[in-house]
Amino acid sequence: MNLNNLKLLAGDASFRKFYRSSKNSIIVFSKKNKYKNLLVYDAINKCLNKNRVKAPKLKKQFYNKNYIEIEDLGNNSLFKILKKSKNKNKIYLNVIKILKFIQKIKTRSIKTFKKNNYIIPQYTKSKILNESQLFLDWYLPRVIKKNEIKKTKIQLKNIFVNLYKKLKLKKSVFVHRDFHVSNMMYHKNKIYIIDSQDAVYGNIAYDLASLIDDVRLKTSINIKNKIYKMYSNLNSSINQTHLKNDFEILSVLRNLKIIGIFTRLAVRDGKKQYLKMIPYAWKMIEYRIENNLNFLELKNTLNKYFSKKLRTKKWR
């Protein structure tokens, strides 16, 4: 297949490229890390569909040629719909119901189109802390004084470890890991979940934090609180104090990670469009740590080394 004859679609933060074919299908191409971007990508989609959560279905695979063909879900992302919608509550309630459904998934092993089994990994302590390290390795060295880098890294790393230790909820559920409205498509009156290749089993509050404190779509505190309340009402059996505790910790760790990822995308991959979202990621971090004693040490350290001016800097 000559990809030059197909329409290249807007991509995501991965090494995948998406093309629209004339056969109501999307060509997903990935030469780099194709195991994750093609094989695992389809395996998780298969897992979601098997558990009655809508996801793109595989039409054909050409793994040896670095691409697969999946169904075309159109261009109507939930992100676009929410930007225009006056009835955000109804949309978010539907999303929360899908999240509750996703968190009931028990499947751990999936047979891939290569006939081997893919085991969905656990979101371990080391994985979460390694992700927080992205903030320290990519963002921090570019914004603070050279002679302060080493000690600040050590200080923040210890704080991240202590925050992880404060997580309360032990139950492990299916976690999409990028559960935000840019990764949801509205197709044939149904919401489809996309970009699911990083799925793991982990803390029940993680995907909720991804959805509510999404850096791509700015929402009011009122909307954020309403979404949280929707989830809380549908999950009344969960210890609500523990849920709030874990939600806030994971939101902060996630948005610190995102600042690191967006910096890496710009510096390493030349994807500078992600830099403009860093100030809002900071805003979300500030909001979550402001009145929570769990974050007192983090708040003081961030205020010492990362000025308000730096956080709101318009990156180019």
What do these predicted ranges mean?
Residues 4-20:
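ATP-binding glycine-rich phosphate-binding loop
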Residues 19-130, 168:
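ATP-binding pocket architecture of kinase catalytic cores
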Residues 133-143, 204-238, 252-269, 281-289:
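Active-site activation/catalytic loop segments of kinase-like enzymes and analogous catalytic loops
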Residues 260-316:
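ATP/Mg2+ or Mg2+-diphosphate-binding catalytic cores
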